[in-house]
A protein has these predicted regions:
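Generic beta-sheet signal
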Residues: 135-137, 233-241
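Nudix hydrolase/Nudix homology domain
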Residues: 29-30, 92-146, 150-151, 155
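N-terminal strand-loop-strand
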Residues: 1-33, 136-141
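Unchanged
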Residues: 38-64, 69-122
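A short, acidic, amphipathic alpha-helical segment used as a generic capping/interface helix at domain edges
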Residues: 219-235
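Active-site-proximal alpha-helix that buttresses catalytic centers in soluble enzyme cores
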Residues: 36, 47, 132-218, 224, ...
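Conserved Nudix-box catalytic region and its N-terminal flanking loop in Nudix hydrolases
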Residues: 15-59, 150-158, 162
């Protein structure tokens, strides 16, 4: 199946009203949401982030994943995953052979102009979530040495080779979220997980025992309080912690009823993204580990 990714790119007009971008493709003579194919080795969100810039000329900050569309293109099945994305600045122009017009319209007018009914449904899904969310990314550390293969203190247990490769490939997955802070457990395996990403983004990590396993054993409410504080202060953040901690924090924040669909352990380098507004979680996304 052909894999593709795109977004509902939105902004606020000078009046404060919401606008979304739709594009005209001369090849098909249609109006659509911006999207494009996932390249080999590329994650869906990385592809969506890249395609938005290429097809609209705008940089963006990604929010919740809002829906998936499956259809046939020239007889072959194609799956497109869509995110909400806030436009930040115009940094270029699309290739006119691929996109010759970009229009910013109110959602109702955009839906009227979109050619495909599936695109109109995606706009409706976006409106259900709403704009103006910020992410808190709860990232499990990458693959570490087994406890049975390590004689030292557990807090000093490092990443194994696969974990080091995973850590090097996190940046393209999480760059679209534009986190302003990186927080981490003080365990070495967590510190090593976020190191490349932090240096690439020029962010100084904030270390905390409240996010560690031994800290969790001392005070089981500490990680929840830590994440809730980030939510209350409206800080888009990456938080690197451990498997027994992250699911429990998410369960408390979203409630048992809504947690059922994600009630499983995270594999190394997987994450749950909490999309927040006004101190509350309005959507959650499960992020798979990087392809190795």
């Amino acid at each position: 199946m052909i894999q593709a990714a795109g977004a509902v790119l939105w902004r606020k007009a000078s009046s404060g009203d919401l606008e979304i971008a739709i594009i005209h493709r001369p090849k098909y003579d249609d109006w659509s949401l911006p999207k494009g194919k996932v390249e080999p080795g590329e994650s869906h969100i990385s592809a969506g982030y890249r395609e938005i810039q290429e097809e609209t000329g705008y940089e963006s900050i990604f929010g919740p994943e809002i829906g998936t569309v499956v259809y046939k293109l020239e007889g072959a099945p194609k799956e497109v995953r869509y995110w909400a994305a806030a436009a930040t600045e115009e940094t270029g122009h699309p290739n006119p052979e691929e996109v010759d017009q970009v229009e910013w319209l109110a959602p109702k007018k955009a839906k009227e102009k979109l050619t495909n009914k599936d695109d109109r449904a995606i706009v409706d899904y976006f409106l259900d979530f709403g704009a103006d969310t910020f992410p808190i990314i709860l990232l499990r550390h990458a693959k570490a040495l087994k406890r049975t293969d390590w004689d030292g203190d557990d807090g000093d247990r490092p990443l194994e080779h696969r974990g080091q490769l995973q850590a090097k490939r996190l940046l393209p997955i999480y760059m679209p979220y534009a986190a302003t802070e990186i927080h981490t457990s003080d365990a070495l395996r967590c510190i090593e997980t976020i190191d490349v990403m932090a240096r690439s983004l020029q962010k100084t990590p904030i270390f905390s025992k409240d996010l560690s396993e031994y800290g969790f054993e001392i005070d089981r409410e500490a990680p929840l309080d830590y994440v809730q504080d980030l939510m209350d202060r409206g800080i888009p953040a990456i938080v690197c912690s451990h498997n027994p901690i992250i699911p429990k924090v998410v369960k408390k924040l979203v409630g048992k009823k809504y947690f059922k669909s994600m009630d499983r352990e995270l594999e190394p380098a997987q994450a749950i993204v909490l999309h927040c507004r006004a101190g509350e979680v309005v959507a959650c996304d499960w992020i798979d580990e990087p392809l190795i």
